[in-house]
C-alpha cells in the first residue's frame, strides 16, 4: 500500500520526482564535506565515508537509520542546540520524534509521516539532514564564494600580436566585401554564361561517369599550410575544446600509461613471485607444525572429552544439590514457624498478668461471698424474729380464747 501511494505521489509531482533524492543527497554530501564530517563524525564513530547516493537507495536499513540518527544529532549539536547522541538500543520512534521536534524548532515544516524516516533512506531523510546542514552553515556564518576559473596560458607567439596581423574573421569579411564590389562594378553577361554552361555540359557528358577522388596528400597539405601561414600573418587561436587536442592528449596519456605499466608490471611480477614464495613457506611451515603438534592435539581432544564428561556430571550433581537445597529451605521455613509458635506460647505462659487478674477476681469473689453471707444472716435473723413474733401472737390469742369459766361467772 505504501509503494502504491508513493508511486501516486511521484506521478503527481512529475517524472523528475524519482530523482530528487539523488540530487538532494549529492548537495547534502557536499555540505557535509564543507563541515568536515569525516574528521568529526566518521573517525570518532569508526564509520565508512558516505557514497554519493547513500541515503537515496536502500542498502542496509539498520545501518542507514543509525547513520541518519548519528548525523542528525551531530548537526543539531553543531547548530547550537543540545541533543544527546542516540545509541543503538534506543527506541527508534522516540529518536525520530525528538529529531522532528528539533526540525520544527528551526522553523521547517514536516508534511510527511515519521515512518518515512524509520526506513533510513529516501527523499525525506535527505531533506531532514539537508535542513540541519543549512542551519549549521548559517550558525557558523558560512558564505559561498564565486567560483574561480583557471586561466588559459597562451603561447608567447600569440600574445605579441602585430597590428598588421589579421584574423580569419577579418580575412573572410574582406573577401566577402571584394566579391560584393566586383559584382557591383561588372555587369553579368547572361548570353556568355549560357554559352559557357553549354560547353561545360558537353564536356561533362563526354567524360565517363566515375567518383571524383582527391589526389592531395594530407601531410603535404599541412606542410604547405605551415609554410604559408607566416607570410599571410594569420593567427589561428587554439581551442581547448577541439577534439584533435583531446585526441593528442589521449595519445600522450596512453603512451605514459604504457611506459608506467611496463615499469609497474616488472615490480608487480617481482612482488607476485615474492608473495607466492612466502605462501609456499607458510604452507610448508604449517604442515611441519601440524605434524609436530599432532600428538598434543590428540591429547588436547581427549582432555576436552574428559572435561565435557566432567561438566556433564557436575551439571547432574548440581541439579541434585539444587533440589536438596530447595527441600532444606522448605524444612527450615517450617522450623522457623514452629519456633515462632513455641516462643509465642512460652511468652504467654511466663507472663504474670493473667495470674494477677485471676487472684484479683478470687479476692473480689470472696468479698462478695462475705457480703452475701452477711445479708443471708440478716435475712435469717429477720425471718426468725418475725416467726417468733407470730408464735407469741398466736399463743396470746390462744390464751385469750381459753378464759376460765369461773372467772366468767363471778362477773
From Swiss-Prot:
Residues 317-408 are annotated as: pDED. Its main location: cytoplasm. Residues 161-185, 261-351 form a coiled coil. Keywords: Apoptosis, Cell projection, Cilium, Coiled coil, Cytoplasm, Cytoskeleton. GO terms for cellular component: ciliary basal body; cytoplasm; intraciliary transport particle B. Signal peptide: none annotated. One of its GO terms (biological process) is regulation of apoptotic process. It is found in: Cytoplasm, Cytoskeleton, Cilium basal body. Belongs to the IFT57 family. Required for the formation of cilia. May also have pro-apoptotic function. This is Intraflagellar transport protein 57 homolog. It comes from Xenopus tropicalis. The gene is ift57.
Amino acid at each position: 500500500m505504501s509503494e502504491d501511494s508513493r508511486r501516486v505521489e511521484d506521478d503527481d509531482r512529475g517524472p523528475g520526482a524519482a530523482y530528487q533524492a539523488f540530487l538532494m543527497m549529492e548537495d547534502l554530501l557536499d555540505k557535509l564535506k564543507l563541515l568536515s564530517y569525516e574528521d568529526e563524525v566518521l573517525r570518532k564513530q569508526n564509520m565508512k565515508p558516505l557514497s554519493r547516493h547513500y541515503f537515496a537507495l536502500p542498502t542496509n536499513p539498520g545501518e542507514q537509520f543509525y547513520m541518519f540518527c548519528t548525523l542528525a544529532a551531530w548537526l543539531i549539536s553543531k547548530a547550537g542546540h543540545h541533543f544527546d547522541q542516540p545509541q543503538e538500543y534506543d527506541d527508534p520512534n522516540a529518536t525520530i520524534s525528538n529529531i522532528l521536534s528539533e526540525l520544527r524548532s528551526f522553523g521547517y515544516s514536516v508534511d510527511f509521516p515519521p515512518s518515512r524516516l524509520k526506513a533510513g533512506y529516501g527523499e525525506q531523510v535527505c531533506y531532514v539532514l539537508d535542513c540541519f546542514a543549512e542551519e549549521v552553515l548559517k550558525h557558523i556564518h558560512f558564505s559561498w564564494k564565486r567560483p574561480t576559473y583557471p586561466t588559459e596560458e597562451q603561447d608567447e607567439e600569440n600574445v605579441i600580436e602585430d597590428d598588421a596581423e589579421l584574423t580569419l574573421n577579418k580575412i573572410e569579411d574582406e573577401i566577402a566585401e571584394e566579391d560584393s564590389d566586383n559584382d557591383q562594378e561588372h555587369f553579368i553577361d547572361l548570353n556568355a554564361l549560357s554559352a559557357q554552361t553549354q560547353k561545360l555540359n558537353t564536356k561533362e557528358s563526354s567524360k565517363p561517369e566515375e567518383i571524383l577522388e582527391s589526389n592531395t596528400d594530407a601531410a603535404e597539405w599541412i606542410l604547405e599550410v605551415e609554410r604559408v601561414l607566416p607570410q599571410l600573418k594569420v593567427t589561428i587561436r587554439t581551442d581547448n575544446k577541439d577534439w584533435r587536442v583531446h585526441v593528442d592528449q589521449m595519445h600522450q596519456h596512453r603512451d605514459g600509461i604504457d611506459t608506467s605499466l611496463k615499469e609497474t608490471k616488472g615490480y608487480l611480477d617481482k612482488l607476485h613471485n615474492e608473495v607466492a614464495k612466502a605462501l609456499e613457506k607458510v604452507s610448508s611451515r604449517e604442515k611441519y607444525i601440524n605434524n609436530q603438534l599432532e600428538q598434543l592435539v590428540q591429547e588436547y581432544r581427549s582432555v576436552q572429552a574428559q572435561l565435557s564428561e566432567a561438566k556433564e556430571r557436575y551439571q547432574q550433581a548440581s541439579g541434585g544439590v539444587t533440589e536438596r537445597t530447595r527441600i532444606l529451605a522448605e524444612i527450615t521455613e517450617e522450623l522457623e514457624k514452629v519456633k515462632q509458635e513455641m516462643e509465642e506460647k512460652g511468652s504467654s505462659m511466663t507472663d504474670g498478668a493473667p495470674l494477677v487478674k485471676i487472684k484479683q477476681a478470687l479476692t473480689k469473689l470472696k468479698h462478695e461471698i462475705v457480703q452475701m453471707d452477711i445479708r443471708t444472716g440478716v435475712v435469717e435473723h429477720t425471718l426468725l424474729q418475725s416467726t417468733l413474733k407470730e408464735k407469741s401472737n398466736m399463743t396470746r390469742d390462744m390464751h385469750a380464747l381459753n378464759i376460765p369459766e369461773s372467772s366468767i361467772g363471778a362477773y
